[in-house]
Amino acid sequence: MKKYKFWGWEQADAKPITDTCKGIHKPADLYDALSHVWCADTCAPRLRDQWKPENMTLGQCSITAFLTQDLFGGKVYGILRPGGNYHCFNVIGNCRFDLTNEQFGDEVLSYDQSTEQFREVHFAKEEKRLRYEYLKTELKKYCER
C-alpha cells in the first residue's frame, strides 16, 4: 500500500458523489491527480513567490478543500492561522483529512480547533474563485487524458 504525507490519509476512505473525474475513487486518488495539477498559478497570490514543485501544496488549501467537497461531499473546516487566514481541510462523515497540510513541514496542526468554512465567503474574493475554477478545469483535463 502506498503511503501518503497528507494528514488523515489512512482513514480517508470517502467515496465520490459524482463521476466527473475518471479514475478518482478515493481522496488519495485525488491527491495523486492534483500532484500533476497544482502549480504557481493555483497558489494563493501572497505565497506565489515561495511556491515550488517540492512544496506543491503551498497556498492551495481552500480551493483544494472546496474542490474535494465537490467530488466527495461533506464539509470544509478551517484552522485559524497567525495573520487571520484559515487553513482548510475536509470532513466527510467520520472521515477527516487534509490534502494540503504538507505545506507546513513538521508543524503539527490542531484539527480539533476548527470552524466550518463556506465557499460563498471564500469565493467572494474573485481571485480565489478564479483559482478554484482553474484548478477544477485543469483537474478535469488531467482526468480525461
What annotation goes with each model-predicted range?
Residues 1-145:
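A structural boundary/capping signal
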